[in-house]
């Protein structure tokens, strides 16, 4: 089961990294930059694929759920643990908000 969960996170992160560079682009903009086939490989920065806040939030949500499970929390407790995970994410990204409201 754990390997399936890891696989889901990895596949989601790979898809996010592949599409992150064109997240707010329309089809014509993508084709003009990448050709008729669109994106066929990840843009790497220093050999690393960059993911968006979407993947980061997935990870922090899972972290909150794991913390809640470790503490045998009820639903309300789980929500609080996820909330605290989001605060940890936010505290590392306060300086990083674009004018569009998205994080880098």
Segments (PLM) and residue ranges:
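Structured, active/binding-site neighborhoods that engage oxygen-rich ligands
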Residues: 1-104
